[in-house]
Amino acid sequence: MLRVAVPNKGSLSEAASAMLSEAGYRQRRDTRELVMVDPDNDIEFFFLRPRDIAVYVGRGTLDVGITGRDLLLDAEVEAEELLPLGFAASTFRFAGPVGDFTKVEELEGKRLATSYDGLLRGYLAERGINAKVVRLDGAVESSVRLGVADAIADVVETGNTLKAAGMEIFGEPILKSEAVLIRRTGQEGAANGTAKEIEVLIRRLQGVLVARQYVLMDYDIRKELVEQAAALTPGLESPTVSPLRDSDWVAVRSMVPKKETNRIMDELYDLGARAILVSSIHACRI
């Protein structure tokens, strides 16, 4: 049975469970549940603190897990990223009092507060910057005002909290993060017979990602305009073209990027396409 770690709370939790549900896996109904078995898919879910998931997976206690890329790298364990999942996007950035810093090199000899000391130490070492890292469990933006640090390194989503604390971002992003599926480094599942289950899980999650990014578009077009229409709707490989009762017309079906739906519909209509319909994709295998 495949053993999977899932975030039990925070910004990762709800989105991870929703994605797994879309992929056809049973999920808990009560947030107090710590373990849940899905016998139909021969899989067991363990709901854990997001920060601990990489540790469990890295030690081989659990087969795979969903966590943030930032948390994976900060844990400094033998675990690797299998698949980016497209949600919980954020950046890990430096920030300091407005006007105090403009570039990373100015952090030499300074005190830096962070909740991601492993990730930060690695970044500073790579660049030869000597700074004192002060580890805090949260609310690091208050550390400068309280005299604990000169600047901070933290995960930033909107930046509003930093602005409210009188701070500004400087330097390039330390890391661009999002939710990721992880497994133990070098472990392909052969040791405990879960290789096939992991492959199926990845394929299902990839299907959800594609289904979220694309829609299915159907339309009718005159035969002589098919090539021009196909240039607008090339699909992932090629559009499906089917004959209609009127031999001068054909029906076309193609997957198109969801964010470009209305633009493509307008251009098809201007070209001469009619009966243009769009359908959601709930699941797919590419």
Swiss-Prot record:
Known catalytic reactions = 1-(5-phospho-beta-D-ribosyl)-ATP + diphosphate = 5-phospho-alpha-D-ribose 1-diphosphate + ATP
Question: Part of which pathway?
Answer: Amino-acid biosynthesis; L-histidine biosynthesis; L-histidine from 5-phospho-alpha-D-ribose 1-diphosphate: step 1/9
| Cofactor(s) essential for the protein | Mg(2+)
Q: What class of enzyme is it?
A: transferase
What are the subcellular locations of this protein?
A: Cytoplasm
Q: Which UniProt keywords apply?
A: Amino-acid biosynthesis, ATP-binding, Cytoplasm, Glycosyltransferase, Histidine biosynthesis, Magnesium, Metal-binding, Nucleotide-binding, Transferase
> GO CC annotations?
cytoplasm
Supply the EC number(s): 2.4.2.17
Activity control note: Feedback inhibited by histidine.
InterPro entries tied to this protein: ATP-PRT_HisG_long, ATP_PRibTrfase_cat, ATP_PRibTrfase_CS, ATP_PRibTrfase_HisG, HisG_C, N-reg_PII-like_a/b, N-reg_PII/ATP_PRibTrfase_C
Q: Which domain of life is it from?
A: Bacteria
Tell me where the signal peptide lies.
none
Query: Which Pfam families does UniProt cross-reference here?
Result: HisG, HisG_C
GO MF, any single term: ATP phosphoribosyltransferase activity
Q: GO:BP terms for this protein?
A: L-histidine biosynthetic process
The UniProt entry, under HAMAP family, shows: HisG_Long
Role noted for this protein: Catalyzes the condensation of ATP and 5-phosphoribose 1-diphosphate to form N'-(5'-phosphoribosyl)-ATP (PR-ATP). Has a crucial role in the pathway because the rate of histidine biosynthesis seems to be controlled primarily by regulation of HisG enzymatic activity.
Family label = Belongs to the ATP phosphoribosyltransferase family. Long subfamily.
Matches recorded under NCBIfam families: hisG, HisG_C-term
Protein name per UniProt: ATP phosphoribosyltransferase
Source species, please? Arthrobacter sp. (strain FB24)
